Regions:
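Non-catalytic surface loops within mature trypsin-like serine protease
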Residues: 11, 96-98, 169-171
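Catalytic core of Fe(II)/2-oxoglutarate
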Residues: 116-179
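Catalytic core of non-heme Fe(II) oxygenases with the double-stranded beta-helix
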Residues: 73-143
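Short, charged, solvent-exposed linker or helix-capping segments at domain edges/interfaces
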Residues: 60-61, 104-107, 176-179
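Extracellular structured ligand-interaction cores
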Residues: 4, 67-68, 78, 89-93, ...
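Non-heme Fe(II)/2-oxoglutarate
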Residues: 1-72, 78
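A general structural signal for short secondary-structure junctions and capping/turn motifs
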Residues: 60-64, 82-86, 134-136, 155-158
Length: 179
């Protein structure tokens, strides 16, 4: 199974524009002062209900959005090698801001234990250092990434914040990694 796969989504420019506008107008996450952790749920803001273009675009792939989160970074220390705490194989990441020259990297030999971020999001923190990078992708368009394996984000720290929208779908978007 591949670690990532780019996909085409119709209305991607509208999705990106509405997502950024939503974050600016309805959340504090564009400001560094509000930073408590990189992975932030948009469920309390009813984001998916306010951006129907996401569901319309995913429907063409036989997918239905279940959850929307953002991954916000201000520097490379904001992300570490980890596995997402989820039953999902993959999520769809959509670049929203300052993603040029940044990479999602994938690793083998990752050992981990469950932790909870200050944002309340659980994840699997890596407990070893002898993991091996096996792949990487620049998130420049909607991309399914394999979140059940070890991964990390490396960013260009001169362009902040770096923000991706990350979508959990039914059926699992990770199943498309084999196509």
């Amino acid at each position: 199974m591949s670690y990532w796969k780019r996909i085409e989504l119709k209305n991607i420019d509208i999705i990106k524009e509405k997502s950024l506008e939503f974050l600016k107008m309805h959340t504090p996450y564009m400001m560094k002062e509000s930073f408590k952790g990189a992975f932030i749920s948009l469920a309390p803001y009813r984001f998916l209900q306010k951006t129907p273009e996401i569901a319309e675009s995913l429907e063409e792939h036989g997918l239905f959005p279940e959850d929307a989160n953002i991954y916000v970074m201000w520097n490379n220390k904001d992300s570490v090698v980890h596995k997402d705490y989820t039953d999902s194989i993959g999520r769809i990441n959509i670049p929203l801001l300052n993603c040029e020259g940044t990479y999602t990297t994938f690793y083998e030999n990752v050992h981990s234990r469950r932790l909870v971020l200050p944002t309340g999001a659980p994840f699997f923190m890596t407990t070893n250092k002898d993991y091996i990078e096996v792949d990487r992708v620049e998130i420049m368009q909607p991309t399914i990434i394999k979140v059940c394996d070890g991964h990390n984000v490396l960013m260009d720290e001169t362009k902040v914040p770096r923000i991706t929208l990350t979508l959990t779908c039914t059926p699992d978007a990770g199943l498309l990694l084999d196509d």
